[in-house]
């Protein structure tokens, strides 16, 4: 699994709106990193680096975070995950980021991205592949995390569904959804059903006529 890197600075002034606004004007985004064995640490990240990172990662991506003080000395280094991102309602700019530093052997909850590959059998017959979940909430050990879960749908026929219980999750990872929850299904368009029914009726009609002829004879 690819590991991404990010550098941050210790944020000494915390909770003061004026200081936070000044920080943002300077091109930085305030954030915090915390975990089971990590005391909350206030940090600031260069906005351009953060935006670049967001284009490369998901909630399930491991990020190697290094935090330095104002003198450039490293004060913290840990593998982290993005836990929460706050956006400005008007400008949609990133306002704050929470990073979670997991403890080895300690389970955590994330949303695992699902990637569907292949073309379902049912699609070739006119069906439509409906995706009910693009992410799967899971509880997992840090070493079991994958950036995404690939799901092959090529064997799904008309009317067939893929359930949570059908997914092959890494050892140490458990789905938070009911095992009977539908992940994806190949639905049959109503027009296709009508055509099939009409075809059955047409094939049955000659038999009736044939019987009528025999009775007349």
From Swiss-Prot:
GO terms for molecular function: 5S rRNA binding; structural constituent of ribosome. It comes from the Bacteria. Belongs to the bacterial ribosomal protein bL25 family. CTC subfamily. Residues 187-217 are annotated as: Disordered. Residues 193-207 have a biased composition (Acidic residues). Keywords: Ribonucleoprotein, Ribosomal protein, RNA-binding, rRNA-binding. Residues 208-217 have a biased composition (Basic and acidic residues). Gene3D superfamilies: Ribosomal protein L25, beta domain, Ribosomal Protein L25, Chain P. GO terms for biological process: translation. HAMAP family: Ribosomal_bL25_CTC. This is one of the proteins that binds to the 5S RNA in the ribosome where it forms part of the central protuberance. CDD domains: Ribosomal_L25_TL5_CTC (cd00495). Pfam families: Ribosomal_L25p (PF01386), Ribosomal_TL5_C (PF14693). Part of the 50S ribosomal subunit; part of the 5S rRNA/L5/L18/L25 subcomplex. Contacts the 5S rRNA. Binds to the 5S rRNA independently of L5 and L18. GO terms for cellular component: cytosolic large ribosomal subunit. InterPro entries: Rbsml_bL25/Gln-tRNA_synth_N, Ribosomal_bL25/Gln-tRNA_synth, Ribosomal_bL25_b-dom, Ribosomal_bL25_C, Ribosomal_bL25_long, Ribosomal_L25_dom, Ribosomal_uL5_bac-type. The keyword Nucleotide-binding does not apply. This is Large ribosomal subunit protein bL25. It comes from Thermosipho africanus (strain TCF52B).
């Amino acid at each position: 699994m690819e590991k991404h890197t990010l550098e941050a600075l210790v944020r000494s002034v915390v909770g003061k709106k004026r200081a936070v606004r000044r920080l943002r004007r300077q091109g930085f985004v305030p954030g915090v990193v915390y975990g089971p064995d990590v005391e909350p640490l206030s940090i600031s990240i260069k906005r351009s680096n953060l935006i670049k990172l967001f284009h490369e990662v998901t909630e399930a991506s491991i990020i190697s975070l290094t935090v330095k003080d104002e003198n450039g000395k490293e004060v913290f280094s840990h593998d982290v995950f993005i836990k929460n991102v706050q956006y400005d309602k008007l400008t949609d700019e990133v306002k704050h980021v929470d990073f979670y530093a997991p403890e080895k052997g300690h389970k955590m909850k994330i949303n695992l991205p699902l990637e569907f590959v292949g073309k379902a059998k049912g699609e070739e017959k006119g069906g439509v592949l409906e995706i009910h979940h693009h992410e799967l909430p899971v509880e997992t050990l840090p070493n079991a995390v994958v950036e995404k879960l690939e799901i092959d749908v090529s064997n799904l026929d008309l009317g067939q569904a893929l359930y949570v219980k059908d997914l092959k999750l890494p050892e140490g990872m458990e789905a938070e959804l009911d095992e009977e929850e539908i992940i994806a299904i190949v639905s049959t368009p109503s027009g296709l059903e009508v055509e099939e029914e009409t075809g059955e009726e047409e094939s049955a009609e000659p038999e009736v006529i044939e019987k009528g002829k025999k009775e007349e004879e």
